[in-house]
Structures are given as C-alpha cells and as structure tokens.
C-alpha cells in the first residue's frame, strides 16, 4: 500500500433541529405515522409557494462561524433537477453557485498528530422523502414526512489520507453541530449522514486519481470499514494494471464490501438554476455579529480548558468533551466538590457504562452530577471503599439515590476502627498458617491474598490502607 496515497473528501448532510420544515410550517418530528407531516408545499402540489424558515439561515450561519467559514452576505437557492419517487417536485431546492458559507476548516488529531481539514462550502437545502420497499406485496411506498426537512450539506476539501482521519473529522464535525444545538447528530435516525469520495494516486503524484463515492455509511465503524475495503479494492485494480472506474458504490455492512450502484455514464446532470420562487438570502453585518456573540464554547476550546484548568490528560479531556452534556455533567460535578481527575475516571468507567446500557444521555440521568460528587467525596473521606462504591453504583444510577443516605441505610460505611480490624487480621492469619510461613520466607506477593481474605471477611468494608498497615505489623 506504500505505493499509493489515499485521498478522501467527505460530504455530510446534517438535519437541523428546527420545529418546522424549511419551506413550510409542517412539523419535523421524527417517528410519526407515514405522511402525517405533509402539506401542499412539501408534497409538491402545483400553485404553492415556499416560505423560508429564518431559523435555518441562523443555524447554517452559526455552523459556518464555528468552522471558520466566510459567511456570505448574499446567498441564493437553486433548483437541483432530477427525478426520483421520493422527490415530489421533480427537483430539490438547494444552493449551488452562491452558498451561505465557504472556505472553513476543522482541526483534528490522530495518533497525537494535529491536522487541519478544509471545508469547501456549507449550503442549505431540503431533504427528500423516503422510499419504503415492501417484499410482502412487492410494492414500494413513499413517505414524505422527511421531504422539506432542513439540511445543511458540509463539503470538505480532499484533505484526508486515511479512514482514521475521516472518522476523526466526522466526530469533530458532529461535536460542533451538537454543541451549537443545531443538529442532534443521530446517525441511526439519519440526522447525520455522510458520503465519502475515495481515490488513490501513486505516491508523489499531484494529480488526483479516479474517485469512487461511498454511500450507506450510517455509523463511524461503517465509515472506517467501508473506506478500508475500498482502498484495498482500488489498490488491487491498480496493481493488476487496470483502471478505477468513477462510480457510486453502496457499502454492505453484513458482507463488509462495496458494490457498484451507478457509473459515471449514469451520473446526473442536475441542470442547476436559481429558484425563481425564492429571493436571495441577505444577512446584515449586525445580525452576523449577534449570532457570533451567541456561539457557545466549542469542543476544541473546552478540551484545552479541561487540560489547563483541571489537570486532565488530553485523552480524558477529549472523551469528556466529545458530547456536550457529558462535559456539562463533569463541570457540574467538579463545581459540587468532586476531585476533577477522580470525577473524570468515574464518568468514563461506571457512569458511561450505565448510560450506554440504559440508552440515556448524561443530562437525563437520575444520578445527578451533585450525587456523583457526593460519592467521590465519600471515597476520599474514607467513608466507603472504591470497591463498595462500584458495587452500589448501579443502584444509585438506576434510582437516583443520595449516596450518603444509601450508605448509612445499608450499613456500608468503611471499617476504620483499628481494634475491630485487628481481630479480623488475626483471624485470617490464624486460619492460614502455611501462607504466613511462606510470606515470612520471602513470598511477599501473598500480601494480596491476605488483604483479599480480610476484605471478604468484612464484606468489603475494611479500610484497605489500615488493613495493609496492620498486616505489615503482624507479619513484620
């Protein structure tokens, strides 16, 4: 593979979190009955006129500002003409020659190496409907609930050189969208979708190779696997002296392969032209300044602050800031008195596992940040051991219980009375004379065995530090 350089550009479609569609007042709510959120405008009836949702312009511009784009004071909608059953008007309202945003970037880090990925453009457009194919009656149905739902398409420069960079770019882009609260980033529901354009060229060659566009990439893992397969496929063709065909290929996750969907000769000539039903979008400088002032702290800035202010590692800061609600949960826990590094460890282990199993976001967890802070402080004070804390965490999480009250009610406080523990230590040593003799003979690793037996005898409530101290004294 060292003979070839991989070149990848990505197109992302992000559904915006508006309450109504881009050109009509129909709801954008997901999961309703087919064709429930439909009107004459989004079903393409003749004689109707679109009315632009102003919030779409605001959200698109804010994404442009957050990614360092030039936000154009004037942008124009265009008709993208093609025929498909889920496109009732026979064209998609999009932007072409004059998009709302251009010339931005996103910074990524892969294996400790920082890189800047260019963004060619961000433009507004409407989503298409959805075709539903029924094998039972050999029919295809069209659901127009998604038709006219607002999208922004984010087109990158061909700056990525491998699947790891693509995944890092997509995660960074998704995080920005979620932090801005303009998109929920849900890949399973299709609100964050991407296509990847992949090509190879001999190392040292400036000219791009022939690209294949990969579709049906609905998870970060699928993106990684599809690109890996496609790179290998194209390399095999070139090694055999063949030529890569420009085409669109569909990723099959079950087989981990890509298959041809359509070739260059089948590619659409979309015949773009300005939409006569929509006036140019004009953004005043004062409005843009207002939107810029409303931008939240973005993931990269928050990550750097977590490292500087809380002493977290780059890795911990990256994990905690990947999701806005996790970052806010962490800050709330620290504000409630939790040690930052210990709170970070609990969040990345116990809390994250419970959140994933329950399928809930951190902001919806019954165990509040203040209660997590209380748990961390109970461990720090010696009231309970880390082992006990892990044992009770599922109950605390599921019921949103107060840790201090729960520990008191269950009698789980750590035993730190040296007299009480001394009896337990003597009992364990008396029950294991052979191990005591072996320890005194040099097998010091048996210390862990003795500690384990004492913890078992005290049901995990013995103070580990005091146990070690007493054992050292007794075995001295």
From Swiss-Prot:
Keywords: ATP-binding, Ligase, Nucleotide-binding, Protein biosynthesis. GO terms for biological process: glutaminyl-tRNAGln biosynthesis via transamidation; translation. The keyword RNA-binding does not apply. It catalyses: L-glutamyl-tRNA(Gln) + L-glutamine + ATP + H2O = L-glutaminyl-tRNA(Gln) + L-glutamate + ADP + phosphate + H(+); L-aspartyl-tRNA(Asn) + L-glutamine + ATP + H2O = L-asparaginyl-tRNA(Asn) + L-glutamate + ADP + phosphate + 2 H(+). Coiled coil: none annotated. Its EC number is 6.3.5.-. It is an enzyme of class 6 (ligase). Heterotrimer of A, B and C subunits. Belongs to the GatB/GatE family. GatB subfamily. Allows the formation of correctly charged Asn-tRNA(Asn) or Gln-tRNA(Gln) through the transamidation of misacylated Asp-tRNA(Asn) or Glu-tRNA(Gln) in organisms which lack either or both of asparaginyl-tRNA or glutaminyl-tRNA synthetases. The reaction takes place in the presence of glutamine and ATP through an activated phospho-Asp-tRNA(Asn) or phospho-Glu-tRNA(Gln). This is Aspartyl/glutamyl-tRNA(Asn/Gln) amidotransferase subunit B.
